[in-house]
């Protein structure tokens, strides 16, 4: 791979990493909120023991679980791109 191609790819990977890290911060914040909401709904369901409260808890927990999966996927994407970035940097150094 030519030096200019490696440099261009490094730039692309770096930009995507920046986007994913920002997305990860947002996902972390949203997950904290959704987890708190699910926990509150769980407590309300335990206290009230009504079908409606239980359904609200399940819905809130489902949203929190979905955000947790999204967060894990974004974190995995960041790790993968960091490895790619390391490999590209190694190639760039090896070409000198």
Predicted regions span which residues?
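Amphipathic alpha-helical coiled-coil segments
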Residues: 20-24, 63-84
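Short, charged, amphipathic alpha-helical segments
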Residues: 11, 29-33, 54-62, 78-84
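Amphipathic, non-membrane alpha-helical segments in soluble helical-bundle scaffolds
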Residues: 3, 24-31, 75
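N-terminal acidic leader/helix
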Residues: 11-22, 26-29
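Short, glycine/alanine-rich amphipathic alpha-helical segment
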Residues: 47-70
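Extended alpha-helical coiled-coil "stalk/arm" regions
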Residues: 27-48, 52
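Short, charge-rich amphipathic alpha-helices with coiled-coil/heptad character
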Residues: 1-17, 89-96
């Amino acid at each position: 791979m030519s030096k200019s191609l490696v440099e261009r790819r490094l730039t692309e990977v770096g930009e995507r990493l920046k986007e994913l890290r920002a997305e990860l911060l947002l996902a972390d914040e949203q997950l904290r909120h959704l987890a708190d909401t699910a926990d509150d709904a769980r407590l309300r369901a335990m206290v009230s023991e009504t079908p409606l409260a239980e359904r609200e808890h399940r819905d809130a927990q489902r949203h929190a679980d979905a955000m947790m999966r999204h967060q894990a996927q974004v974190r995995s994407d960041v790790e993968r791109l960091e490895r790619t970035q390391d490999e590209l940097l190694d190639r760039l150094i090896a070409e000198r």
